Curated annotation (Swiss-Prot):
Protein name: 3-hydroxyacyl-[acyl-carrier-protein] dehydratase FabZ
EC number: 4.2.1.59
Principal subcellular localization: cytoplasm
Residue numbers annotated as active site: 47
Organism: Methylococcus capsulatus (strain ATCC 33009 / NCIMB 11132 / Bath)
Length: 146
């Protein structure tokens, strides 16, 4: 799935669209995506100018956007392409390695369960096979505009 297709599913836009491409998707199971991190990212201006590091909360946001894509692909008939998935919970958040300009962040979301409109996913971020971060992410589905 390229960026144009991603934009059909996610409401985010520059500078907050943090998924560049979907590499693999098994609806109901898992989704693997990438974020190419460049020195031109707006957050590097202040975090930190001499030692640029991607903020951990933005790594989590990239993972949350990945979960929204997996949920949309898993249950397109629930709310359709116009659905918005809101981040409603985080558990077991861990960070191990900083993400710096030039890194390609691999984002993996694995479906755990859902009840009504709340979805849960196990998520992991890596750079070149090296563990960066992980979290259990919960999101809620809502129709666009609600």
């Amino acid at each position: 799935m390229d960026i144009q297709a991603i934009k059909e599913f996610l409401p985010h836009r520059y500078p907050f669209l943090l998924v560049d491409r979907v590499l693999e998707c098994e609806p109901g199971k898992r989704l693997l995506a990438i974020k190419n991190v460049t020195y031109n990212e707006p957050f590097f201006q202040g975090h930190f100018p001499r030692v640029p590091i991607m903020p951990g909360v933005l790594i989590i946001e990239a993972l949350a956007q990945t979960t929204g894509l997996l949920a949309s692909e898993t249950a397109p008939d629930v709310l359709g392409k116009g659905a918005t998935y809101y981040l409603v919970g985080l558990d077991k958040v861990r960070f191990k390695r900083p993400v710096v300009p030039g890194d390609q962040l691999r984002l993996e979301a694995t479906y755990l369960r859902h009840k009504r409109n709340i979805w849960a996913f196990a998520c992991r971020a890596d750079v070149e096979g090296e563990f960066v971060a992980s979290a259990e992410i919960m999101c809620a589905a809502a129709e666009q505009g609600s």
